[in-house]
Amino acid sequence: MKKIWILLIFIFFFSALNCRADEVLTEDKIIEEYSQDESINSNLNSLYTYIDNMKTDIELINDLNPVEYIKSYIKNGKGNISFSLILKSVVSLIFKEVKTVLKLSLSIIIIAILCSLLKNIQDALSSDSISNIAFYACYLVLILILSKSFLVSISIAKEAIYGISAFMNGILPILVSIIALSGGVMEVATLDPIILVAVLIIPKIYVNIIIPLILISFVLEFANNLSEEHKINNLCKTIKQITLWLQGGIITIFIATLTIRGITSSTIDAVTLKTTKFAIDNFIPIVGKAFSDAISSVVGYSLIIKNAISSMGLLILVLIILYPIIKIVLISFIYKMSAALTEPISDKRITSSIEGAGNAMVLLLSCILSVSLMFFVLFAIIASAGKFIVGG
């Protein structure tokens, strides 16, 4: 009988020691285990390569090392990126772009002044036909200058939207995989269709439908000011309203669907996880509680990795859109300022055309901002996914 008791006590302490060893896992151990997962490791390597390739096109992320950033975030709770260097790069970029757009502003103002002088000279000679020829000659040069800068801005906006889409296509599979491995199966199942729509369809809607509508409104502004008598103001306003309605509708539907489905799925995952942990705690003798706590610890570390990747993703997303926003904001401001400066001295049709071009630039800027907003919200939903695991 005594031997049996000794054997039972030995087994009990032996099992407890094993459970303790399994439960205590260091951060480096968890990171190593995640790096050994083939799917996650493959996606991470692809993401690192993609970010390194982006550095040739986006100079603001030259100082970002994705591998070191994630390691620093996991160990210290924050990345190792120097925001002072980023700020210095942004200021340098702004000054460089200001020099460029000031040349554009100077060209516009000179043409407006020249048009005004020619008109005054021809009015003094009482020759309407020559005056009209001089006006249309200056107007044509103005159209060429504004169109060149606007087409460059359209190209920048398209590249920004496609760049955001490509980056999201690279980082979202990793985040979704980690959420699924952390127990958020229902959340992944509901987010997958939304992510597919966001990454593949929404950028095409903007590039192939909304931006061409903005280009049409830009062209119609010049047609509207060709004549002082025949106007198409209502058509210009209608096209602008359509572009705004399309953007507002897409944002509203996307965010509402994402929020509702995310809340519902996270609730289901929370109930499932608590039920599973309760079953492990109560139906597995001796080691059930330790095993349940070990699962929570491992999953908690996986969420830290997810948050590190999400933090880096948000930072890169901001850096991707920063240059296009700075460029388009400055050009739009120059258009508006040029229209204001030339209004007292130039023909009303000239200033109206410049102001209309500025309004079209604002619509172009809204495309980048609305696409960025949707992906920001998607990032926020994914970053908050899995919090029930730690609290559950």
Which stretches of residues belong to each language-model region?
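Juxtamembrane helix-boundary/capping and inter-helix hinge elements in multi-pass membrane proteins
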Residues: 127, 228-232, 343-351
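Gly/Ser-rich, low-complexity
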Residues: 1-112, 116-135, 149-159, 163-164, ...
